[in-house]
Amino acid sequence: MKISALALLATISINGQVYAQDSQIQPPPHQPEQASAKMPECVILLHGLARTSKSMLPLSEQLRAQHYLVVNVDYPSRKFPIATLAEKAITPALENCRQYPISGINFVTHSLGGILVRHYLSLQKIPELKRVIMLAPPNKGSQVVDNLKNLPPFGWLNGPAGKELGTESTSVPNTLGAVDFDLGVIAGTSSVNLLLSLYLPNPDDGKVSVENTKIDGMRDFISLPASHPYIMKDDAAITQIIHYLHHGQFLHAPATVDNKEL
C-alpha cells in the first residue's frame, strides 16, 4: 500500500497531534471540604505519544469533581524509549500521590501511557495500586507503526518510543506479557484519519485496531464510537472511566431478545 509523502506528513504522528513537551508533574489538589472524611484515592493521568497533560484536562476536571486527587502528568514522550519514559513519568507521579493521605492509587492512561504502566509494573509493584483504565492502548502494537516507522518523518514526530510500538513479537508491548493487575480497556471504533485506517484491521480508531487494544488478563473491555486523538475527551468514555473506578467494571448495555431485556 502506498500513500503520498504529503499525506504522510499530515497523518504520520501516531496520536495525530504534536506538542512541545516538558517533564512537569502537576500536584493533586487538596480534598474538597464537602468530600467525605474517608481518605480519597489518587488518580494518575498519563497522556499519549506527542501529547501533553492538556489533552487530559477535561477528564481531570471530572475526576476532581468526584473527589479524586488527580496527578496529571507531563512527560517527554518523543525524547526517550519506553523504558526510560516509564520511570520518568510514573515515579514522580507516585511521589506526588504519596504526599497526601490516600486510600489507593489508580491510573487512567491514553495510548502510549498504558504501555508505560505495563512496563513499570513488569519491573516493580505499587502496593497501593487499585485500578488501571487504558484508553486506546496499543497493547499488541499498531500496524501503522509497522508500515511507517522506517520513514524519517515518523521518527521525528514520534521519537524512539513510537518506533517501539509495532506488532512484531519483539516490540515492547508484545514482550510485556499478560497483565496481573485490575485493568479495564476502552477502545475506540471511529477514525478521523482514514489514510492511517487503511493500514489497520477494522474496527479501528485511526491509530490502533480494536483487537490490538486487548490484552490477556484484563478484567473488562468496552468499545465506544470515539477516535484515537479525542477519546480521552469523549463524554461516554469519561462516564465509563468513573464507573470503572467506582465499581471495577464498565457499564455494558443489557442483552436483549426481541426488544426485551434479558
Across the structure, where does each feature detected by a protein language model lie?
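Serine-dependent carboxylesterase/thioesterase catalytic core
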Residues: 41-54, 58, 64-76, 82-180
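Short secondary-structure boundary micro-motifs
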Residues: 27, 32-33, 45-46, 91, ...
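Helical cap/lid subdomain of alpha/beta-hydrolase-fold lipid enzymes
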Residues: 40, 122-262
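Flexible, membrane-associating and regulatory peripheral segments of lipid-active enzymes
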Residues: 2-46, 50-73, 86-87, 93-100, ...
